Amino acid sequence: MSFRERLEQTIAQNHSLLCIGLDPDLERFPTGIPRDPEGIVVFNRAIIEATADLVCAYKPNLAFYLQYGAAGIAALATTRQLIPPHIPVILDAKLGDIASTSAAYARAVFETLGFDALTVHPYLGSEALEPFLSTSDRGVFVLVRTSNPGASEIQDLPVGEAGEPLYLWLAERARAWNQRSGNVGLVVGATYPVDLALVRQRCPDLPILAPGIGAQGGDLERAVCAGLTEATAPLLVTVSRSILYADASARFAESARAAARRVRDTIERIRKEVAGQAGHR
């Protein structure tokens, strides 16, 4: 089964476009959770058990584990094993290097650690991405329009004869790569709903991973409308801190579940409204 098929199967099973980011911040851990790599496993286990029926995917960010060295990587590997096998897990690592190095990264992420997908940056061109694109059962999400405030410094630069912004040009390139490999998605920040809509118009058939809802200030309704209108592929709405740290008490997992359910249900309501509007055109 391809990565895309597995993703869509989980979306249908859980009626969810919610992707929870597993980004542990020890300083924000609830009462009773050790503030060390072992505590990361305890915390993540509780979050996963509380939300596994509400998500379409999980997305751990490599940096939040790598900062603790070997013990942090061990916590990441254990976290991967804790997630039910039918739920896709995307490693947010933003990788990309010369071909031989990317091949080593691909083996580490897909084979050694067993992740289903990862995020990559396209700055080195298609040669650097080839090792990630070569297997249809693993997903590759290409950074196109990131959610951070400084994204426009580079991503809005005009390119080509038409002078279109770089992020749109990259989206077109990623779509071309997908025609060959079938496993490409895009990363487009929910903090830029106008740009998200433009990317979706160009790439209706590519999955989009949309970070930035919650702590980064993205508007959920605008982002979901932008990412689903004219779409034939999923929009994965990524939320991390506002779910993980919804409560600092011993009932943190229960509160995380409630927060995740609210987001999941809101997305589902908007999705149905968008689908209804499309049906009346």
From Swiss-Prot:
Output the CDD domains linked to this UniProt entry: OMP_decarboxylase_like
Q: Which family does it belong to?
A: Belongs to the OMP decarboxylase family. Type 2 subfamily.
Give the domain of life.
Answer: Bacteria
> What is the protein name for this chain?
Orotidine 5'-phosphate decarboxylase
Source organism: Thermomicrobium roseum (strain ATCC 27502 / DSM 5159 / P-2)
What HAMAP family does this protein's entry cite?
Answer: OMPdecase_type2
* Documented EC number(s): 4.1.1.23
Leading EC class = lyase
User: Which residue positions are annotated as catalytic?
Assistant: K94
What reactions does this protein catalyze?
Answer: orotidine 5'-phosphate + H(+) = UMP + CO2
* One example GO MF annotation: orotidine-5'-phosphate decarboxylase activity
Per the UniProt entry, what are the Gene Ontology biological process annotations, in alphabetical order? Answer: 'de novo' pyrimidine nucleobase biosynthetic process; 'de novo' UMP biosynthetic process
Instruction: Report keywords, A-Z.
Output: Decarboxylase, Lyase, Pyrimidine biosynthesis
Report the pathway entry. Answer: Pyrimidine metabolism; UMP biosynthesis via de novo pathway; UMP from orotate: step 2/2
